From Swiss-Prot:
One of its GO terms (biological process) is GTP biosynthetic process. It comes from the Bacteria. Belongs to the NDK family. It is an enzyme of class 2 (transferase). SUPFAM superfamilies: Nucleoside diphosphate kinase, NDK. This is Nucleoside diphosphate kinase. Its EC number is 2.7.4.6. The gene is ndk. The keyword Cell membrane does not apply. It is found in: Cytoplasm. One of its GO terms (molecular function) is ATP binding. Homotetramer.
Length: 140
């Protein structure tokens, strides 16, 4: 098993309801370690650039608007097989299909306001982490 790092974003629907601590506890209970974390207000340019891969999808505009609707918590999580473990702990994108105990089953309001984002591959994790964090902001 390899120690990996992945990007996690606690989205505006969750920060608005002060769920950061509860979500962090789910991650940590699953064996993921928070090695960087910051609470920020994304600009439209930042959110648009981050989600540029979805630019041609019908939900892109709404996604960008949602991601700038309030503060987000950006995190780098570390652990054994962190990318897959984080995705398992987040649960299905649609909270109605998310397994009990997952972040989305517990906290998501809808498929759009689903509380968290997580990298979908190790390659994307590295790209996404570098988008938001300087190496000096991440614990060794």
């Amino acid at each position: 098993m390899a120690t990996e790092r992945t990007l996690s974003i606690i989205k505006p629907d969750a920060t608005r309801r002060n769920l950061t601590g509860k979500i962090n506890a789910v991650f940590e209970d699953a064996g993921l370690r928070i090695v960087a974390q910051k609470r920020v207000q994304l600009s439209e340019a930042e959110a648009g650039a981050f989600y540029a891969v979805h630019k041609d999808r019908p939900f892109y505009g709404e996604l960008v608007s949602f991601m700038v609707s309030g503060p987000v918590v950006l995190q780098v999580l570390e652990g054994e097989n962190a990318v897959l473990k984080h995705r398992d702990v987040m649960g299905a994108t649609d909270p109605k299909k998310a397994a009990p105990g997952t972040v989305r089953a517990q906290f998501a309001e809808s498929i759009e306001a689903n509380s968290v984002h997580g990298s979908d591959s190790l390659e994307n994790a590295n790209t996404e982490i570098a988008f938001f964090f300087a190496q000096t902001e991440i614990l060794p």
